[in-house]
């Protein structure tokens, strides 16, 4: 059970990292070009400066997430708190973008998925810190045996699938003048 919890936690962290980095990078088109996009996205023009900041912060949070997840999985000091900081930064940047999208254009997709996954992962990371679970799962010490390699491999596999499948799940929300910009 402890091995499964460790693997599930790392997989969700990897998914959140992918969503955070791709979400930040994907927002760049709106952050720099909302006034020229037309349609619903043109409604985001008043907040272009804020979106530019969110792009930088989201990508930085995703990179910090890579660092913190490696520290956590290896049982290094500060790994858990660094991971919480990453998840809070990701949730805040995604939440602000969610708010702008909902109020200005009336739709939150695809950022809504990023926000939900980040908050869910944050809940997992907070729950594993409960004393009974924390002692069993062992994120405060280096993993034994093949557990770290298995968790890392599973996380890379799932992240790779998610990245390769991006045109499938992102395409419906990335149409510009009838052209699918996600393909």
Indicate where each model-derived feature is located.
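Topology signature of small-to-medium multi-pass alpha-helical membrane proteins
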Residues: 1-183
């Amino acid at each position: 059970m402890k091995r499964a919890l460790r693997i599930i936690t790392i997989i969700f962290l990897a998914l959140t990292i992918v969503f955070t980095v791709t979400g930040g990078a994907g927002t760049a088109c709106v952050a720099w070009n909302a006034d020229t996009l037309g349609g619903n996205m043109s409604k985001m023009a008043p907040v272009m400066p804020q979106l530019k900041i969110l792009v930088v912060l989201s990508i930085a949070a995703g990179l910090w997430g890579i660092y913190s997840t490696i520290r956590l999985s290896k049982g290094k000091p500060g790994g858990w708190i660094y991971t919480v900081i990453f998840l809070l930064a990701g949730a805040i940047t995604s939440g602000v973008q969610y708010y702008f999208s909902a109020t200005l254009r009336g739709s939150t997709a695809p950022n809504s998925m990023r926000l939900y996954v980040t908050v869910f992962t944050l809940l997992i990371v907070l729950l594993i810190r409960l004393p009974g679970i924390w002692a069993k799962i062992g994120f405060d010490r280096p993993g034994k045996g093949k557990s770290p390699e298995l968790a890392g491999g599973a996380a890379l596999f799932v992240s790779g699938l998610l990245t390769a499948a991006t045109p499938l799940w992102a395409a419906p929300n990335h149409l510009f003048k009838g052209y699918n910009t996600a393909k």
